[in-house]
Amino acid sequence: AIGSAGLGALVLFAAYSNDLSYFAANGDKYPYFANIGEISFDLSNPYVVAGLIFGGLIPYLFGGIAMTAVGRAAGSIVEEVRRQFKEKPGIMQGKDKPNYGRAVDLLTKAAIREMIVPSLLPVLAPLVVYFGVLLISGSKASAFAALGASLLGVIVNGLFVAISMTSGGGAWDNAKKSFEDGFVDKDGQRHMKGSEAHKASVTGDTVGDPYKDTAGPAVNPAIKI
């Protein structure tokens, strides 16, 4: 899935480059592109370098926002569970039935609300790049070049960020499971469940689950968009 997202985004960049060349060559039909000049993605152009840096920042920013969103949504569920335990003490003994529907409804609303900003980020970022460079340089060619460079930055960095998050999160998750099965280190010492190493792996699993299940896979559509 990650590789297909990278290849798909690469095809979109090729289409973007070809369309720019076509519109620039037919400025009489498309007045906005009239006398725009040649658009190149030469690294000697400072706006291209700026676009690469800005585009490379997007996957990290997207992943960070997604990770904090998971924490806030989980926190709202913890508060709801505590409230139900307080109002219905018999839940722990099986005498009272918890309100599952409210918890699911609360989590669904929190998930949708928290993903609004990450969803808008890849949509608004190209507009910010284009009009920002256009305002600074006054050149449409430089603005389009910076926009294309930002797309390249997202593709390259996003691909490796997604791989890092999914594989790294999976490693943290499996580390906890290995301690539960009785992990033997290189010195022959066995670390069982409840050991200090296992407690550290639980912390790693807490980060690893949203890392591999939320932020990592979510970077794929961000690359394509």
Curated annotation (Swiss-Prot):
It is a multi-pass membrane protein. The chain crosses the membrane at residues 5-25, 47-67, 116-136, 143-163. One of its GO terms (cellular component) is plasma membrane. One of its GO terms (molecular function) is inorganic diphosphate phosphatase activity. Its EC number is 7.1.3.1. Its cofactor is Mg(2+). The keyword Transmembrane helix applies. Keywords: Cell inner membrane, Cell membrane, Hydrogen ion transport, Ion transport, Magnesium, Membrane, Translocase, Transmembrane, Transmembrane helix, Transport. It comes from the Bacteria. It catalyses: diphosphate + H2O + H(+)(in) = 2 phosphate + 2 H(+)(out). InterPro entries: PPase-energised_H-pump. It is found in: Cell inner membrane. Belongs to the H(+)-translocating pyrophosphatase (TC 3.A.10) family. Homodimer. Proton pump that utilizes the energy of pyrophosphate hydrolysis as the driving force for proton movement across the membrane. Generates a proton motive force. This is Pyrophosphate-energized proton pump 1. It comes from Mycoplana dimorpha. The lineage of its organism: Bacteria, Pseudomonadati, Pseudomonadota, Alphaproteobacteria, Hyphomicrobiales.
